[in-house]
C-alpha cells in the first residue's frame, strides 16, 4: 500500500466516523489525515497546493459550524479527488 492509498483510506474512514456522529473520534483522526495530506501535497504543483488551501479552509469552516456531514463530504470527495489528481 502506497502512502497515497493509505491517506485516501484514512480520509474515507474519517469521513465515515463523522457521518456516524462520532465527531470527537473523527476530529482526532482528522488531524492525522490533514498531516498526511499536507506531506503528500508539499511537492505538488502550485495550483494543486492552492486548491488544497481552499479545501482545507472549507473543511475547517465546516468543523467550526459543526457541520459534520459537509465536512465528511469534503474529506471523502473533494480531498480524495485532489489527492488522486497529484502526479506520482
Which positions does each model-derived feature cover?
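C-terminal-biased regions
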Residues: 1-88
Amino acid at each position: 500500500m502506497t502512502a497515497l492509498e493509505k491517506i485516501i483510506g484514512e480520509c474515507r474512514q474519517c469521513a465515515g466516523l463523522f457521518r456516524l456522529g462520532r465527531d470527537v473520534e473523527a476530529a482526532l483522526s482528522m488531524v492525522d489525515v490533514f498531516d498526511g495530506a499536507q506531506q503528500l501535497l508539499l511537492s505538488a504543483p502550485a495550483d494543486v497546493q492552492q486548491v488544497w488551501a481552499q479545501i482545507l479552509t472549507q473543511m475547517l469552516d465546516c468543523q467550526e459550524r459543526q457541520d459534520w456531514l459537509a465536512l465528511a463530504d469534503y474529506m471523502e470527495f473533494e480531498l480524495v479527488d485532489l489527492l488522486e489528481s497529484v502526479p506520482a
